[in-house]
Amino acid sequence: SYGLMIRDAVNNVVVPEILSIYGKLYKLAVEHKDLSMLARTHGQPATPTTFGKEVLVFVNRMKEELMQLGNIEILLKLNGATGGFNAHNFVFPEFDWINFSHQLINSFNAEITPLDNEYMHTKPLKVRFNPITAQIEPHDSYLRVFDGIKRINNILTDFAMDTWRYISDGWIKQRAVAGEIGSSAMPHKVNPIDFENAEGNFGMANAMFEFFVRKLCISRLQRDLTDSTVERNMGCAFAHSMIGYASLQKGLGKIEVNADKITEALETTPEVLAEAYQNLLRMSNVDKPYERLKEITRGKKVTIEDFHNLAKNLDVSDEVKARLLAATPLTYTGLSGKIVEQFDAKIN
């Protein structure tokens, strides 16, 4: 019964909520696929990207996990007190109990209706008969589900934390909600409480899922009862996950991307062109290009004019010089926009 409850909870409640977030993030990525943005690695300015491509990173991760979830079958038992069909075979020895159990459990898959979702049409979880068990089905298939949900929760935690930072930097604006208290002491504040609430609930859910994964695969000899009290709490982990999803959706409904602020941050960080310059100079056989760029940029506040002065004084072809002078932080985003355009959001 727990296996069927997990299947139905994931198929009918959890996955539709995850897909709702998936769709919102995908549309956000498409909408801002060409919005040039300063990347940060180790918290420091790095090669420019686009806002849409960075959101798509999370979308793609979610897609991969949802596809993995679709490969999981929850195993069920129907084979007697210690897994040998003892009583069944003793009373009706002529009956094919193994085949009967297989067919009966497989019939539960007929109950699964398609998902009404533009990205995913097939509900991910199905059930299958496990003919080789002790008194209990070993729960390993439950744990694969829990690990899958946990990874999705981690991905969404990562997104919530990044969004929190973008809000802090002013790159994302939050719409004030009438009647909502931002801070008990500072009336001006609009705090990112929905993203923080999502992060906290995903942490609670995953702490429980991690314990389930450690505990439920272990049972003394043919069975002990320690799994029983643990299984009664599986719903709590799903509940915290659902609160996290709802909080994240609420937060997404109150934000808008501040394109001007994102553009300003990138335009005032021209040092990110150092990568472009040093690679083109290397291709042009300029001596020690990395060191030359490091000398004018590392630990210094540079301007676009500093790069232009370097380019003008280089012994390179006019074509290379023109390419260097035309480069700007806003245009140095590689194929980021194209990556978003070519992404297939359908989950097979």
Predicted regions mapped to residue ranges:
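Conserved, well-structured ligand/cofactor-binding cores
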Residues: S1-N348
